[in-house]
Amino acid sequence: MRENYETLVSVGTSELLPLSAFLSPAEAGGATSGESHQDKGQKPHLEHSSQGEQPQQSLHLTALVQLVKEIPEFLFGEVKGTEDYSESGSTSLDGEQTSPEVAVVVEACPPRGLLNSLPESPASHPSLATTPTGSSTSGGPPGDWAHGSPLPAIGTDDKPLSIEKEGVGASRETSIHSTQSLGQSKSYLRQERGSMGTGTLPENSPLQGLINCLKEILVPRPQHRGTAPDLPPSLPGLSVLKQTRAEVEAGSLPCPVKTEAASGDCPLQGLLNCLKEIPKAPDRRPSPSGASDLQLQEDPGKRHSGGMRHLQTPPHPSHEAGSMLATVKVEDGWAQSPPVPASCQLSRQGYSSYSTGDNREVRVPRWGPMTLASRASSSPLEALEACLKGIPPGGSSPLQSLAISWSRSPQLGDAGSQRFELQQQGSHSEEATREPLLPLSLQGYMREGPGVQPCGSQGTPTSFSSASSSDGDLDFRSPRSSQGQRLGKGYLPGNSPLQGLENCLREIPIPRPQAAWPCSSAVNRGLKRTEPRNWTGDREGLRGEASEPPHLRQRPGEVPSRSLHQDSPQTCTSTCHQVTTRPGTWQWPQEETATMPSPLHRLENSLRGILPVRPLRFTCVTGPGPSPSPCSSSSFSSSDGEDLRPEPAFWQSPLQQKDQPPSCKDPVRLCPVSGASPRVNSNSCSAEDRERTEPRDCSSLSAGRAEEKPHPPRREDGAERTRQPGPVTNAEGKGAAAGHPSPAPQLEEKPEPKGTEDSRDLEPGHRPPSAAARTQGKLLSGDPPESPSKSPLPTTVLSKWSPTSLQPPCPCGRSLQQELHNLGTALTDKLDRLAAALAGLTQEVATMKTQMDQLRRHPRSLGPKGQGSWQLALPQRPRWVNRLGHRHLPYWRQKGPTRPRPKILRTQAEGCKTSDRPGLSRGKGSLVPQLPPEASLVESSRPTCSSSQQISSTPGGHTVLTAHPPLEHTACHQNPLSPSVPTSVQVPLVASPATSADTEPPAARVAAISIPNQPKEPDSLLGEALSRDLWGGDHRDPRWGAH
């Protein structure tokens, strides 16, 4: 925290030093008016220096300095001595005990008096530090409000608001200190404020409560210290809140923050004490989740001057009603903020409360970290300023949180949400669900907050100011809301200080926010990352500030929760975009970079750490969750990059780790397209794949997968994997299938070389077919190199292997996936061919129909041979049709009903049986009349369609596809010829089922199996696709029958 404070100081060194120097006299206590003068004199100077010297942090520091400077002004407005004293008391809580009542009396003036009261509040500002919102508010905003100019809407209301804020803070501190004189002063101040037109009863006014608290703090310094611990969150957060409010409301940070800065704790000891107590306050505050905060507010108000309670009540109504988001809301927010002695909560709740009610108040937990930051700073004014700056950071990240909070502060809703998130962390109540990402990105979103800044600047700033002063830590709690806005402006420039503060915040959030955030998001460290993951990640990774926290949260270990939950890389990207530090993104995932100004550095770091993990998460998400994780994770991990490698343990996919680089491309490409298919494939092959090569074996299961496996290695170790496709694939694919290396790669490669290989090669990196390819093999991209080299050689062997290796591991699923992929690629070509074939086939069908009608009669009269063969063909055909393509059944049935046509063709074929063409008779799916079996296979789509191939079985039972002569296929019984056809030809062409089964069981079966599992050759794929579509049915029918 001290480092954070130092960072904050360094961020606003000139401002801080002037404030310190300015406050030092005030702290001396002797120069009440002198301090006031110093405040005033230095106020412009500090303001100038803070704004001029440090435009980045100047927003915070300038606001703080201005507030401090204006505190004397406001106090001077009525009674300089009192003002000086109050500010002096604020500055040196322990030393300055000039009667706070004097300051209160001095502030009797409605506008001036109110502001004077506020300066008095600054005097008791340490008490404000003690009081979550009231003290800080009175310290920071009082002068600011009195200033009025910085807070346009607060003009007249400004002071009342400031008074209210201070009243609230005072109420808190009063409750803490229970000083009746303070209560009286508060009543007086409130009366004056009421006359001033604040519309809040003098007693109920938050300023009055703040004044009372300040008086109590100033008079009983020990009590103040007790108060400080009692309401520690108020000072830092309030100061920050004031800054934010002043900035947001007035459009400039000067007054609000300045007041708080001016009222820096005696030596920030009061503030530090408050901060120390802040963790306690947040602890109890989180329990009530806002209600407790109100109670705290109420209690302090009751025990001190009952005004605080009123303040609490008025702030809330005002807060809710506050039409002037900036001014009135600030007032209300401040008023409300003090009611939450937890203060950070209230101030957050200020704008948050008005937007979400008291729930935000419960965001006290943030004050814990803020408390740490505040404690860290012990200089009187510097410590106060550092607390103001670092209070939000203390809770979230010293300066970063503040900057984020300010940046976020403008977005009322967002700030509220953030506050909600923080509150959620504190109370772990409805807020957690409602805005998990905000808390998670609270810091990250704080970065984003600047984007939302305008929204919250109206009301959030007010509440933020209150929270900043009174709930400095709470400001941290909602650094996005209140801190982000301010820092949103200036924290980027002060990135280096902010980064130091960020580091501090990262450390700070971890100790306490982790406890608080875990409440809401620690449920599932890994899984909770989905929503709270960001929170948890932010706090976990100490990058909680960055919007990246979500991404960081989605660390390798965390990826599963989001990845598994989110099935698509898109979701993962948007949700996991925030890695360990995470987004929101996560949305996406890029929000971390785009919307995390909180600390730019932190954002960068978070992005560095998160981006790799998040893609992995996306990959994981894209992959089938935990079960399919191996397959999808394998390719996704590759696509995600190296970060997923840590996740492999989570994903249970060694292949991920091994194949992360190789899959790098594929997963990205596959994630979107193959999100569902890979899951299906992974699910179907999940068990077996895990057994063999959990991730890669899934690929191996699908013929293309094994090839793809080697190919991804090809990316990684293209040569090595290509050389060792089987072993590498298995080893990479989880090394589970040590015995399957050769078969799996061969099988996969074998089919792939023909059709899948080409298609996958066409889409090595990101083609949609890669979804099927990915399901078949996660490493589609790697397929082409190995597939070509391996597939040709193992085509025959692989076809043999295919039946054995492919069948055991989800042959159907993989075959379907491969076929889908092949059909996607080859189907297009085949469809084109089919279109042409259909054109000719239509004519042929018409002719065939006519002939069929005639031949129906003829075949009937032809005799048992024709009928028997026709009958055989008919039954086999339907079977083949069903086997080949269930989806193609309609086409086949359409043609199936035209069985006479096949009969006609077969009749003609019978006539030409002697001259039967083996390729045609085999009906291997040759689209073109196949004199050679191979040629017929290549042209299978055309002959199949054109001949409306009649499936006839010879007595031997071999199914023969008879092509109509017009189809350029002389329908001939393939039964005898198919055996005669070279085995090599039959294998590639996948001889008719009967032929494959009877004549050449090994080769034909291998070919048939390999084809169903995965078309090996492009022609085979085309034939398969065609058979599935329409024409390939006959060709595929035999294959399917064999399959």
Swiss-Prot record:
The annotated region (Disordered) lies at 26-56, 113-186, 279-321, 413-497, 528-590, 621-816, 910-929, 1010-1043
Q: Where is the composition biased (Polar residues)?
A: 172-186, 566-590, 788-805
From what organism does this protein derive? Mus musculus (Mouse)
Q: Which residues form a coiled coil?
A: 825-858
Indicate where the modification Phosphoserine is found in the sequence.
Answer: S99, S181, S252, S352
Keywords in alphabetical order, please. Answer: Coiled coil, Phosphoprotein
> Which gene underlies this protein?
Krba1
Q: Where is the composition biased (Low complexity)?
A: 126-139, 630-639
- What protein name does the entry list? Protein KRBA1
Q: Where is the composition biased (Basic and acidic residues)?
A: 36-50, 156-167, 528-551, 687-697, 705-723, 747-766, 1031-1043
Which Pfam families does this UniProt record tie to the protein?
KRBA1
Concerning InterPro entries, the annotation shows: KRBA1, KRBA1_rpt
